[in-house]
Amino acid sequence: MRIILLGPPGAGKGTQAKLISEKFSIPHISTGDIFRANIKEKTPLGIEAKRYIDNGQLVPDEVTIGIVKDRLTKDDCDNGFLLDGFPRTVAQAEALDEFLKGINKELDVALLIKVPEGFILERMTGRRVCTSCGASYHIRFNPPKIEGKCDICDNELIQRKDDTEATVKERLEVYSKQTYPLINYYKDNGIISEVNGTESINEVFGNISNILGRDK
């Protein structure tokens, strides 16, 4: 099973990716993780990527694609993989398809977790974290017993900069510009499947499992 996972920030992709990886015994390949691994191991591509990152520049497609290609040739990908965070553009998707076709491992499904913007804003802006022990809360879905105080250590709860409304809206705007053309690309290829991401974790995973079971 070879899967691309798509969805906006706050859609729960990380949670679902872990569950999919465990159930179908395929590696969850996050581009962030493989970038960090290549930089840490000082591979030629990692060194090149670090040079761009250190200069505050976007890593060019050829470097990103090279790192992903290298990861997909590992033995643990023989029976499939779940790609999370790549591709981000149609150009990257085309390069990935060309590579996978060349090794006879074409994609089975592009899985899109759909969540309305208002739901994501509520989900992400409501998150709070303890400044001391790192415990996580949500002002609506998992509130602390005392407002603004951690249940565990009684220290202050804060909203991270990444969870402010302005930052979340900015990330959603970037996602829309980048990903809508990508969604249309996979629709044209006939491999996209959509899941409602507003349901519970178990319900979303149940729907994903049904889709992946059909596509096996």
Curated annotation (Swiss-Prot):
Keyword field contains Zinc: yes
GO cellular component, as recorded: cytoplasm
Binding locations of ATP: 10-15, 127, 136-137, 199
Gene Ontology molecular function terms on file: adenylate kinase activity; ATP binding; zinc ion binding
Gene3D superfamilies: P-loop containing nucleotide triphosphate hydrolases
This protein's UniProt keywords: ATP-binding, Cytoplasm, Kinase, Metal-binding, Nucleotide biosynthesis, Nucleotide-binding, Transferase, Zinc
Residues involved in Zn(2+) binding: 130, 133, 150, 153
Reactions catalysed: AMP + ATP = 2 ADP
Enzyme Commission number, as recorded: 2.7.4.3
Function, as annotated: Catalyzes the reversible transfer of the terminal phosphate group between ATP and AMP. Plays an important role in cellular energy homeostasis and in adenine nucleotide metabolism.
Subunit structure: Monomer.
Family: Belongs to the adenylate kinase family.
Domain notes: Consists of three domains, a large central CORE domain and two small peripheral domains, NMPbind and LID, which undergo movements during catalysis. The LID domain closes over the site of phosphoryl transfer upon ATP binding. Assembling and dissambling the active center during each catalytic cycle provides an effective means to prevent ATP hydrolysis. Some bacteria have evolved a zinc-coordinating structure that stabilizes the LID domain.
Protein name: Adenylate kinase
Organism: Clostridium botulinum (strain Okra / Type B1)
Gene: adk
